[in-house]
UniProtKB/Swiss-Prot annotation, chain A:
Organism field: Vanderwaltozyma polyspora (strain ATCC 22028 / DSM 70294 / BCRC 21397 / CBS 2163 / NBRC 10782 / NRRL Y-8283 / UCD 57-17)
Subcellular location: Cytoplasm
Name of the protein described by the UniProt record: Translation machinery-associated protein 22
Subunit-level organization: Interacts with the 40S ribosomal subunit.
Keyword annotations: Cytoplasm, Ribonucleoprotein, Ribosomal protein
Pfam family, one: SUI1
Domain SUI1, residue spans: 98-169
Amino acid sequence: MLQEVVYCGICSYPPEYCEFSGKLKRCKVWLSENDTELYAKLYGNEIDEEVANAANKLGSSSIGEAREEKLEKDLLRLQAKQENREQRELAKKLSSKVVIKREARTKRKFIVAISGLEVFEIDMKKLAKTFASKFATGCSVSKNAEKKDEIVIQGDVLEEVEKYIHSLLEEKGLKNVKLEIIDSQKKKKKPTDEANSNNNNNNNNK
Amino acid sequence: MFKKFSKEDIHSRSKVKSSIQRTLKSKLVSQYPQLEEVIDELIPKKSQIELIKCEDKIQLYTVDGEVYFFQKFDELIPSLKFVHKFPQAYPTIQVDRGAIKFVLSGANIMCPGLTSVGGKLPDAPGFEKDSFVIINAENKENALAIGKLMMSTEEIKSINKGHGVEMIHHLGDPLWDFNLD
């Protein structure tokens, strides 16, 4: 009785609307992998029947050849635009970096602050919640000096966080993203650690 | 209506009592009588409807994290995913192929797109002004938008100019991509 509609895994539309999403190429790949039947129905055997297909399309469309052509052109342009945008975004993602910082609070207490995650479409609040339960500690999202969101974890969990974020990014297919670790407490670090140098880190520097 | 919509617009979430759930369902059926035979399949008795109150007095009703219908004033409007499951039950109009692109980017639907060869409007008496319609497209099976008639379908036919249907919800808008977690 009820209809089951397949939704494209790329653009989330029903596959018949993929051509309007601007991601047609990837949609096609997805559909051919996931639902060959529907793929054949929608796109036919394009390689040897492209011409026939085009004629078919024109025949079944009511808006006339000229407008159909224009539409096709517009769609192509949209697609190119979308692709460019995606490329740009990917480049941006690859070039940006995640900063994990360990700061000292009082005596032997530390917090770890992570910033630069928002580029990767990660839900900060949710991640904060995960960290809180993973490390059994307080964790929240707050604004840092540059008015950007950062996750603040209470406790000295620098290494664990680093590992976790590595695996998180890997899952997203972004293995080459740089992780910058700033640790104001290590002795070997160069003295260029600006912000935290005035904190009371005398203990370790002795 | 959903041009801009995000999680920040959510004010509260609450579970709907089963008695209210029942009235909701009967209200849906009274609005769309053909839903009667499948309503228990669409929304099983045991399912838990959740009410999400949002900015601008918009209320979303979700089941299992998926928006099934929403409400701005009195009338319940089904979401597209809900429509796709049983499209026969709703008043439907059709736009031609040239209009799809604009509809998917959220434009109101212009009369010529409905009256041209590819478009389809019901025969007289048609639908009243201000009623909600499902918008289908030429050569496509599934609905691509939900709109509110800005003039009656007969008027659309005779005037054939300007905005005909106000856009409420379309494929790819923030409500379509809406995800509870």
